Design a protein with these regions (language model features):
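Iron-associated oxidoreductase/ferritin-like identity signal
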Residues: 1-186
Length: 186
C-alpha cells in the first residue's frame, strides 16, 4: 500500500466510525437510555476530532488532500424501529437492544484496532515514522475505548442484562460523559 492509500483507508474508516457513534447515540436516545446516548455522543465528538487531526496531519506533512473512498452506511438501527415510538419499547426489547448495541460497539472497536495496527505496520515498512506515530496514538485511543466497551459489556452481562441495573446507571453515565464533553475531552 502507498501512503495515499493508507490515509484514504483510514479516513473512510473514521467517517464510518463517526456514523456508527451518531447512530448508536440515536439508538440509545430512542430507548431512553441517556447514559449510553451521551457515551456515544462523546465518542462521536472524539472520532470527529481524530478525523480532523488525521486530515490536518496529511495536509501538513504530505501537502495533499486525502482521496475519498465510498463509505457504506452502517445502518445500525433496525428498519422496523422506524415504525414505533419510544412508548412502544418494552423491557425485553430494551434489554436485548442493550446487549446487541454493546456487542456491535465492541465489534467495531476490535475491527478499528486491527485496521490501525495493520496500517501502522504498513507505515513502518514504508519508513514513514512520523505518520506511524500518529497511528500509534490512535491505536492507544481505540484500545482504551475497546476496554471501556468490554468492561461495560461484562458488567452488564454479570447482571444477566438486568433492566433495573441498566436503568440505575444511566444518570451517572450521562453526567460522566457530559462532564467529559465540557472539559478537555480530546
Amino acid at each position: 500500500m502507498t501512503v495515499d492509500e493508507i490515509f484514504s483507508e483510514l479516513a473512510a474508516h473514521m467517517i464510518k466510525g463517526i456514523m456508527i457513534h451518531d447512530q448508536m447515540s440515536s439508538y440509545y436516545d430512542f430507548l431512553s437510555l441517556c447514559g449510553y446516548q451521551k457515551c456515544h455522543e462523546y465518542h462521536y465528538w472524539c472520532e470527529n476530532a481524530s478525523y480532523l487531526k488525521l486530515k490536518h496531519h496529511y495536509f501538513k506533512y504530505h501537502n495533499k488532500l486525502i482521496k475519498e473512498k465510498e463509505i457504506e452506511n452502517p445502518n445500525l438501527i433496525l428498519k422496523s424501529w422506524y415504525n414505533y415510538t419510544r412508548s412502544d419499547v418494552d423491557i425485553s426489547t430494551k434489554r436485548n437492544a442493550v446487549k446487541s448495541g454493546l456487542e456491535k460497539w465492541m465489534d467495531w472497536e476490535k475491527e478499528t484496532k486491527l485496521l490501525y495496527e495493520k496500517m501502522y505496520k504498513e507505515l513502518i515498512n514504508l519508513n514513514e515514522i512520523n505518520d506511524a506515530k500518529l497511528l500509534e496514538d490512535l491505536i492507544c485511543d481505540v484500545a482504551h475505548e475497546l476496554s471501556q466497551a468490554e468492561t461495560e459489556y461484562f458488567n452488564i452481562k454479570a447482571s444477566d442484562f438486568d433492566i433495573e441495573y441498566i436503568l440505575m446507571e444511566q444518570c451517572e453515565k450521562k453526567e460522566k460523559f457530559k462532564a467529559k464533553m465540557k472539559g478537555d475531552w480530546k
